[in-house]
């Protein structure tokens, strides 16, 4: 039977699988620690802005997200005209791929990088080239070795999801310096707000001064606006112009726009979340390590826990054990990490329950 046929490569893409969203059961408290969501929710100022926007739902949004672009510009010292807002940074990543990748092109990502990168690459007919990592960390030399005349883009999450590792800014500059000027370097800084390292920078300097670097960011993580789907990009004027030509005219809703503008101004809320995350990330790393499990050093709001392959001690068995206790972590088979679980840093209660649960799991005979 004849029917419409998708473009080549589309059906080869494995659909993105989000973290589990469990249905609470009567009499049992459930902690979702699978999607790197903040346990504190959004800023009260963001919620007030969202509520106030409800009275104007009959009106189309302002098509360029001007209010939000200006708020981002003030927060980071950026030119608002070089900022684009999108329905999550995912939309912007896909728009970049649509603008710059086509059949016969290549884009480089690393072994355990965000799955949207290979999806966006393949969906636009290009080939995803994988550069191996070292200790679950992007390797600049490996990336540069895989750049060919066909390469049009390099994707780099810094810090990386799902490993929680990062590259110092000197390494980012070295990576950029080794790329031909026609290769676009995409720096995804979704988790940057959690980083407290002196050698880390978002990459604003490169995005501001070079013609082939963009920085993307999101309001889904530390700002707690994941449900509103809001992200942004800063980059060269010519990249912004190209992306704006295919961006939907009303791609960011008014409630999302105003909530995000309020959220970015509430620095006290952000700092509170950052301090909590760092404290409990360190605590969890220590507690889990005491159990004989390896934890990849993280600078984000999650940790990557590695399990043995011994029957009775595997990641999948630990996942099932914790789920029965209402503790939902993220299995990572689709990231090529079948022996690991990713855990979002949650409330104190959730963190202690996971530590206790893993202790009981590892003590089983």
UniProtKB/Swiss-Prot annotation:
Taxonomic superkingdom: Bacteria
EC number from the UniProt entry: 2.6.1.9
Coiled coil: none
Any one Gene Ontology BP term: L-histidine biosynthetic process
Pfam families found in the cross-reference section: Aminotran_1_2
InterPro entries hit by this protein: Aminotransferase_I/II_large, HisP_aminotrans, HistidinolP_aminotransfase, PyrdxlP-dep_Trfase, PyrdxlP-dep_Trfase_major, PyrdxlP-dep_Trfase_small
Summary of subunit composition and partner proteins: Homodimer.
UniProt family annotation: Belongs to the class-II pyridoxal-phosphate-dependent aminotransferase family. Histidinol-phosphate aminotransferase subfamily.
The name this protein goes by in its record: Histidinol-phosphate aminotransferase
């Amino acid at each position: 039977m004849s029917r419409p046929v998708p473009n080549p490569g589309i059906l080869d893409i494995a659909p993105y699988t989000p973290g589990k969203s469990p249905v609470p059961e009567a009499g049992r408290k459930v902690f979702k620690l699978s999607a790197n969501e903040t346990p504190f929710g959004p800023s009260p100022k963001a919620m007030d802005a969202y509520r106030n926007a409800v009275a104007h739902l009959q009106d189309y949004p302002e098509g360029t997200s001007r209010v939000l672009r200006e708020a981002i510009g003030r927060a980071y010292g950026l030119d608002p005209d070089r900022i684009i807002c999108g329905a999550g940074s995912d939309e912007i990543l896909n728009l970049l791929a649509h603008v710059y990748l086509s059949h016969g092109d290549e884009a480089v990502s690393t072994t355990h990088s965000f799955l949207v990168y290979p999806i966006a690459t393949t969906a636009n007919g290009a080939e995803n080239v994988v550069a191996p990592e070292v200790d679950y960390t992007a390797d600049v030399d490996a990336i540069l070795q895989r750049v060919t005349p066909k390469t049009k883009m390099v994707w780099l999450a810094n810090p990386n999801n799902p490993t929680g590792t990062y590259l110092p800014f000197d390494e980012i500059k070295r990576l950029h310096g080794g790329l031909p000027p026609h290769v676009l370097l995409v720096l995804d800084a979704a988790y940057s707000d959690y980083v407290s390292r002196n050698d880390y920078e978002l990459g604003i300097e490169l995005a501001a001064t070079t013609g082939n670097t963009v920085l993307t960011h999101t309001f889904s993580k530390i700002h707690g606006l994941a449900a509103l789907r809001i992200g942004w990009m800063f980059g060269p004027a010519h990249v912004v112009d190209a992306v704006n030509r295919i961006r939907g005219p009303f791609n960011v809703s008014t409630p999302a726009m105003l909530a995000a503008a309020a959220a970015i101004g509430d620095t006290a809320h952000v700092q509170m979340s950052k301090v909590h995350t760092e404290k409990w990330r360190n605590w969890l790393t220590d507690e889990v390590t005491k159990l004989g499990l390896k934890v990849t050093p993280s600078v984000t709001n999650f940790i990557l826990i590695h399990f043995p392959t011994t029957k009775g001690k595997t990641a999948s068995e630990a996942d099932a054990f914790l789920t029965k206790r209402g503790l939902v972590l993220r299995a990572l088979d689709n990231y090529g990490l079948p022996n690991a679980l990713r855990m979002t840093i949650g409330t104190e209660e959730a963190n202690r329950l996971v530590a206790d649960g893993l202790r009981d799991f590892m003590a089983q005979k």
